[in-house]
């Protein structure tokens, strides 16, 4: 089983869409260990975007009511997120797509952050970067932290309108491989996810 951890440079960068694309492409299982906000969960979004019944969507280890930072959501509910209690699900040999909460330094409790969870799982990261003013800095800071922690990175997915100069300088500084460009879409559907899943393999094995 291969484990890919989907993280991003910020919140609302496109992690769930990219997770759906990867789950589709690899016929993998999906897991969101820590969900903050229960009105529209990422697991339910993934369910609506997959054609195949091959993938299992595993239940969250922590499902917190408020859509705020996980440490705050847990604290407000009188819960403590304990990393040792978050165990990888049994995928019966399937690859596993793990979707993080926010970015790599989002706190899970008073001492642990998302990056500690990545290390615990010994997962390979796929970084999602949506391009906006300031995103170069956010992307390079994320890459620097991943490198400092010796976390393996499979590659980067750029999400949103193309910005060739921003992409060039990010790749120059990080040495990352571009796995996929995701364009703005009027509506995200199963068909859109499937189309990107096919495109993913253009760069996946290089």
From Swiss-Prot:
What's in the keyword line of the UniProt record? Answer: ATP-binding, Biotin biosynthesis, Cytoplasm, Ligase, Magnesium, Metal-binding, Nucleotide-binding
Compartments (UniProt record): Cytoplasm
The entry's Mg(2+)-binding residues are 16, 99
Entry's Gene Ontology BP terms: biotin biosynthetic process
Q: Name one Pfam family in it.
A: AAA_26
Q: Which reaction does this chain catalyze? A: (7R,8S)-7,8-diammoniononanoate + CO2 + ATP = (4R,5S)-dethiobiotin + ADP + phosphate + 3 H(+)
Catalytic residues at 32
Main location (coarse class) = cytoplasm
Q: What Enzyme Commission number does this protein have? A: 6.3.3.3
* InterPro entries according to UniProt: DTB_synth_BioD (IPR004472), P-loop_NTPase (IPR027417)
Q: Which domain of life is it from?
A: Bacteria
Which residues make up the binding site for ATP? 12-17, 99-102
Q: In which pathway does it act?
A: Cofactor biosynthesis; biotin biosynthesis; biotin from 7,8-diaminononanoate: step 1/2
Name the cofactor(s): Mg(2+)
Q: Has UniProt tagged this entry with the keyword ATP-binding?
A: yes
NCBIfam families documented for this protein: bioD
The task this protein performs is described as:
Catalyzes a mechanistically unusual reaction, the ATP-dependent insertion of CO2 between the N7 and N8 nitrogen atoms of 7,8-diaminopelargonic acid (DAPA, also called 7,8-diammoniononanoate) to form a ureido ring.
From the Swiss-Prot or TrEMBL record, give the protein name: ATP-dependent dethiobiotin synthetase BioD
The protein's organism comes out as Cytophaga hutchinsonii (strain ATCC 33406 / DSM 1761 / CIP 103989 / NBRC 15051 / NCIMB 9469 / D465)
């Amino acid at each position: 089983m291969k484990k890919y951890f989907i993280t991003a440079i910020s919140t609302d960068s496109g992690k769930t869409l990219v997770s759906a694309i990867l789950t589709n492409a690899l016929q993998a299982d999906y897991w969101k260990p820590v969900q903050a906000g229960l009105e529209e969960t990422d697991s339910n979004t993934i369910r609506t975007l997959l054609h195949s019944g091959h993938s299992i969507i595993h239940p969250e280890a922590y499902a917190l009511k408020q859509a705020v930072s996980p440490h705050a959501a847990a604290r407000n509910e009188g819960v403590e997120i304990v990393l040792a209690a978050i165990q990888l699900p049994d995928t019966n040999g399937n690859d596993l797509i793990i979707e993080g909460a926010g970015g790599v330094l989002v706190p899970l409790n008073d001492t642990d952050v998302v990056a500690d969870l990545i290390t615990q799982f010994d997962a390979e990261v796929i970084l999602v970067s949506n391009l906006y003013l300031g995103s170069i800095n956010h992307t390079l800071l994320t890459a620097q932290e991943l490198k400092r922690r010796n976390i393996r990175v499979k590659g980067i997915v750029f999400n949103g309108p193309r910005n060739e100069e921003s992409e060039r300088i990010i790749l120059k500084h990080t040495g990352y491989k571009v796995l996929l460009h995701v364009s703005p879409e009027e509506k995200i559907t199963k068909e859109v996810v499937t189309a990107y899943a096919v495109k993913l393999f253009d760069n996946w094995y290089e």
